[in-house]
Amino acid sequence: MIGKNIKSLRKTHDLTQLEFARIVGISRNSLSRYENGTSSVSTELIDIICQKFNVSYVDIVGEDKMLNPVEDYELTLKIEIVKERGANLLSRLYRYQDSQGISIDDESNPWILMSDDLSDLIHTNIYLVETFDEIERYSGYLDGIERMLEISEKRMVA
């Protein structure tokens, strides 16, 4: 779906693969793989495409959305807020893990599992959001992580 939307955006702007690739700073071969769906598109590249072509994340990652332009804008703003909040929480999680001497290789540790899950959320899953309910669910998830961190940080200080 993302590849098809990138290809559609490129064609809308009447650009060749080479021209589009140069604008977003990738090779033509990479663009071809993204458009054909043989390679996954990084969230960083989605960010660049959205900025260079003034489109929303939903335009790139979502198809057949049933939102009017105002709702689309509101959803895009909420996605940005949740993404930024998630990044801040992830930073706090990493600091907490460091302060507790938790090894990043310990995949059985719940703090590592939580940070991996949060990283997936802010780097991938957030771009697949198509409804306000989904973004609210992610926001609630962030609330839970924040509460756990606050409790753990207070115990650490006490």
Swiss-Prot record:
One of its GO terms (biological process) is negative regulation of cell killing. Coiled coil: none annotated. Induction: Conflicting data is available; found to be a member of the pezAT operon (upon ectopic expression in E.coli); in S.pneumoniae strain 0100993 is found in a monocistronic operon. It comes from the Bacteria. SUPFAM superfamilies: lambda repressor-like DNA-binding domains. GO terms for molecular function: DNA binding; toxic substance binding. Keywords: DNA-binding, Repressor, Toxin-antitoxin system, Transcription, Transcription regulation. Residues 17-36 bind DNA. Antitoxin component of a type II toxin-antitoxin (TA) system. Upon expression in E.coli neutralizes the toxic effect of cognate toxin PezT. Represses transcription of its own operon, PezT acts as a corepressor, considerably increasing repression. This is Antitoxin PezA. It comes from Streptococcus pneumoniae serotype 4 (strain ATCC BAA-334 / TIGR4). The gene is pezA.
